[in-house]
UniProtKB/Swiss-Prot annotation:
The lineage of its organism: Eukaryota, Metazoa, Spiralia, Lophotrochozoa, Mollusca. The cysteine framework is V (CC-CC). It holds the Pfam family Chi-conotoxin. Residues 1-19 form the signal peptide. Belongs to the conotoxin T superfamily. One of its GO terms (molecular function) is toxin activity. The keyword Oxidoreductase does not apply. It comes from Conus pennaceus (Feathered cone). The keyword Disulfide bond applies. Its main location: secreted. This is Conotoxin PnMLCL-01. The modification Cysteine amide is found at C63. It comes from the Eukaryota.
Amino acid sequence: MLCLPVFIILLLLASPAASNPLEKRIQSDLIRAALEDADTKNDPRLLDYVTGACCAGLNFVCCGKK
């Protein structure tokens, strides 16, 4: 009868200590995705298109051209 409370206490202590494999996998996926995103570079054609559209819409104010 005395072993039951000890077993329950040990069970309660051990359950939060167990790691969640899904949580670890999600964390590793997020880290890997962040590293892959850090390696990517912007396409200069896309940047030229965006700045061109911005400058055309604002009469070349943002580009410094007149």
